[in-house]
């Protein structure tokens, strides 16, 4: 297995914890961002300086020692870290050049300028790392290496409990509130039990509605897992430019749940079934109640192996040197 430097997010931690102890020992969690004007200025100088900035310690000393301990020819996966300054500094503290970066966001996300994001990708590729994406459109447009989206097997967390909600959603706004409210109001009027929970955009106010629960802050991932177990079906609404498989889709597959989605690309998945996926604006809306009650077809043995983190990460063992 390659060494891994991973972002400090709770979902990432959930994936990493699926690794056996001997493999988990090869994982470094990247430090959270340190706030402060002085530190930010010195960090920027260190990032763009061709050598290490004398007298400046960009990350905690134990972390820097662990970076230096990675062997010169060892394969290394940088998982979900895209900050250019951090990556430029990391490169100066790593002896290996067999490095891959997996981007866990679409190239053009909902809040960034197209040209700015394109510049970011050019800088990312200019570091000399091999850049991987789960999104086929991004791979084609920007010359990135395509790989699978990733999740993990969840047997220790999956519970067979009576469903409390027919449809469950959790996510940030990302310009999806209006659609969530419309769908929620339609489904509630049809007698369906919904729980659509949304983290608001900072500074934005929202009209009152019983269809969408506006959260004061994000919830921890174990609480999300508990809600998934208590739902019959999950809802995903993808970003406008996204074509790749989402984590929400994999949550549904691994937790044995149905999925309602606005992504027609799910029809191309090897495990697509009309009894497993309901595509908004393509499948008849009147069919939704029957879809929710139809038994979920079983998946073939091993069908999800390519998306399971412990299997997925093995592809990076064979990284060529930059």
Regions found by a protein language model. Give the residues of each.
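Catalytic binding pocket for nucleotide-activated donors in carbohydrate/polymer assembly enzymes
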Residues: 19, 206-216, 221-320
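Short, well-ordered beta-strand core segments
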Residues: 76, 99, 130-131, 234, ...
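A conserved nucleotide-sugar
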Residues: 184-203
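N-terminal pre-catalytic "stem/leader" segment of glycosyltransferase-like enzymes
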Residues: 1-104, 110, 266, 311, ...
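Active-site regions of enzymes building and remodeling cell-envelope glycoconjugates
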Residues: 21-31, 40-48, 128-130, 141-153, ...
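Short, polar loop motifs at secondary-structure junctions
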Residues: 8-13, 132-140, 198-204, 262-267
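Catalytic core of nucleotide-activated saccharide and alditol-phosphate transferases
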Residues: 88-188
């Amino acid at each position: 297995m390659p060494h891994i430097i991973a972002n400090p997010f709770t979902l990432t931690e959930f994936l990493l914890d699926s690794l056996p102890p001997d493999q988990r020992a090869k994982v470094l969690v990247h430090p959270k961002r340190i706030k402060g004007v002085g530190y930010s200025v010195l960090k920027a100088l260190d990032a763009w300086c061709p050598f290490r900035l004398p007298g400046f310690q960009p990350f905690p000393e134990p972390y820097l020692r662990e970076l230096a301990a990675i062997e010169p020819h060892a394969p290394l996966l940088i998982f979900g870290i895209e900050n250019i300054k951090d990556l430029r500094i990391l490169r100066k503290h790593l002896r290996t050049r067999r490095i891959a970066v997996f981007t866990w966001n679409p190239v053009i996300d909902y809040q960034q300028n197209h040209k700015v994001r394109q510049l970011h990708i050019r800088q990312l590729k200019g570091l000399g790392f091999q850049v991987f994406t789960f999104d086929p459109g991004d791979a084609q447009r920007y010359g990135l290496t395509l790989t699978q989206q990733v999740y993990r097997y969840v047997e220790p967390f999956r519970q067979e409990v009576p469903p409390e909600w027919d449809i469950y959603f959790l996510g940030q706004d990302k310009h999806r509130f209006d659609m969530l409210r419309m769908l929620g109001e339609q489904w509630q009027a049809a007698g369906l039990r919904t729980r659509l929970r949304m983290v608001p955009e900072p500074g934005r106010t929202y009209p009152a509605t019983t269809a969408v629960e506006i959260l004061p802050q994000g919830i921890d991932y174990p609480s999300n897992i508990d809600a998934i177990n208590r739902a019959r079906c999950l809802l995903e609404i993808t970003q406008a430019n996204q074509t790749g498989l989402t984590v929400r889709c994999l949550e549904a597959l691994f937790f044995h749940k149905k999925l309602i989605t606005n992504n027609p690309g799910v029809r191309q998945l090897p495990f697509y079934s009309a009894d497993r996926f309901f595509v908004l604006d393509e499948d008849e809306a009147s069919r939704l109640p029957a879809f929710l009650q139809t038994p979920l077809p079983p998946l073939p043995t091993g069908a999800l192996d390519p998306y399971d983190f412990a299997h997925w990460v093995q592809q990076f063992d064979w990284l060529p040197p930059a």
